């Protein structure tokens, strides 16, 4: 598979980049905004990352590798999902890039996911990312206001 479509979603969060970064790399927080998913990694470049959970009654274990870490700025991972229906092989992995941009007391978080094979799949991924980012925003802004 070599997809030419990209999904992109962005959100502005009333929180410092430090807090947003923590939410991207803290398994307890990830579970709260990523559909109850358990994220397992040591968060070092070159390390694996595993996402485990149950979706619509079916257990899953998705995975990838951490390619780049720039704390409070950028996180780049590869990602493969069992739900893709594609074999677990390098050409079927997406690259997911999280970019943080601090502006005063707010952080703009942008997520891009590449190597998507169709516009329909890209639209679906973009919709999922929008939901995830809005949930993350609510979580962090609720923490910020308390």
Predicted regions and their residues:
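Hydrophobic ligand-binding cavity/cleft-lining segments
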Residues: 1-38
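A conserved amphipathic terminal alpha-helix motif
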Residues: 2, 108, 114-146
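Intrinsic-disorder/low-complexity, polar/charged segments enriched in Ser/Thr/Lys/Arg/Asp/Glu/Gln
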Residues: 4-10, 48, 61, 74, ...
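Hydrophobic pocket/interface hotspot
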Residues: 20-21, 30, 49-51, 66, ...
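Residues at helix-coil transition
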Residues: 25-26, 71, 141
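Surface loops and adjacent helix of pleckstrin homology
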Residues: 35, 54, 80, 112
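Hydrophobic-ligand binding "helix-grip"
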Residues: 39-42, 59-104, 114
């Amino acid at each position: 598979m070599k997809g030419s479509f990209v999904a992109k979603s962005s959100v502005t969060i009333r929180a410092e980049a430090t807090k947003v970064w923590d939410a991207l790399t803290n398994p307890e927080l990830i579970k709260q905004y990523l559909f109850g998913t358990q994220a397992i990694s040591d968060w070092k470049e070159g390390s694996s990352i595993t996402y485990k959970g149950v979706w619509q009654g079916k257990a899953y274990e998705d995975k990838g590798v951490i390619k780049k870490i720039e704390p409070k700025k950028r996180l780049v991972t590869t990602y493969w999902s069992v739900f893709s229906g594609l074999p677990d092989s390098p050409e079927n992995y997406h690259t997911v890039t999280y970019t943080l941009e601090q502006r005063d007391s707010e952080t703009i978080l942008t997520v891009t996911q590449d190597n998507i094979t169709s516009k329909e799949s890209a639209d679906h991924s973009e919709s999922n990312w929008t939901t995830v980012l809005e949930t993350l925003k609510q979580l962090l802004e609720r923490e910020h206001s308390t």
